[in-house]
Curated annotation (Swiss-Prot):
Function description: Catalyzes the reversible conversion of ribose-5-phosphate to ribulose 5-phosphate.
Protein name per the record: Ribose-5-phosphate isomerase A
Broad enzyme group: isomerase
Quaternary state and interactors: Homodimer.
Pathway field: Carbohydrate degradation; pentose phosphate pathway; D-ribose 5-phosphate from D-ribulose 5-phosphate (non-oxidative stage): step 1/1
Active site (catalytic residues): E104
């Protein structure tokens, strides 16, 4: 599986050119993209500026010598490459399995070309088998949990290996919703954002331009149909 992820990540790095501002994604597939950017800077003299989507990616990028800027210090991002946990035929997706969904969405928003890199197991007919992460402020989180429960969304607080509640880079909690199937991702996204205490959700609807899918037969590109 790592070989497929590496294939997708390295392929995506081919979209990066000199002088670009590049969004650096988080997760096991985006990791290989960031590594390849680091290699190209070192071996080819590639000149780019990175904008990271998590403290984890910041640490990786700094270790590779990738120059970084805050999302607040740039006008726009030329290309962002990130992973996804599920992608449907309309290229809506679920992200946030690594807990970085808020920063990932903040970086995706000013991005001109937004690309996901996945292995073929992430392409699904309908979203929802993967639990949907919802980032919530700590204050009142238990009330939100009960609200989700009353809606039949089967919530669970994300926890660390030690059993403590997982805290995001932005110091929020994550409640994962076990929905099974999501019939209308856009309506659900709107509903969640309207709930007081919800900071962000892991539905990325209509945001991505292309998805690089690595499978046993190589790499294919799936693009949004006009």
């Amino acid at each position: 599986m790592d070989e497929l992820k590496k294939l997708a990540g390295v392929y995506a790095a081919g979209f990066v050119e000199d002088g670009m501002v590049v969004g650096l994604g988080t997760g096991s597939t985006a990791y290989f993209f960031v590594e390849e950017i680091g290699r190209r800077i070192k071996e080819e003299g590639l000149s780019v500026v990175g904008v990271t989507t998590s403290s984890q990616t910041t640490k990786q990028a700094e270790g590779l010598g990738i120059p970084l800027k805050s999302v607040d210090d740039i006008d726009s991002i030329d290309v962002t490459v990130d992973g996804a946990d599920e992608v449907d035929p309309q290229l809506n997706g679920i992200k946030g399995g690594g807990g970085a969904l808020l920063m990932e969405k903040i970086v995706a928003t000013p991005t001109k070309k937004y690309i996901w890199v996945v292995d073929e197991s992430k392409m699904v007919d309908q979203l929802g088998a993967f639990k949907l992460p919802v980032e919530v402020v700590q204050y009142g989180a238990d009330r939100l949990y009960l609200d989700f429960e009353s809606k039949g969304y089967k919530p669970s607080f994300r926890v660390t290996e030690q059993g403590d509640r997982f805290v995001t880079d932005m110091k929020n909690f994550i409640i994962d919703l076990d929905l099974g199937k999501i019939n209308n991702p856009v309506a659900l996204g709107d509903e969640l954002k309207a709930m007081t205490g919800v900071v962000e959700h892991g539905l990325f609807n209509g945001m991505v331009n292309k998805v690089i899918v690595a499978g046993k037969d190589g790499v294919k590109i799936v693009e949004v149909k006009d």
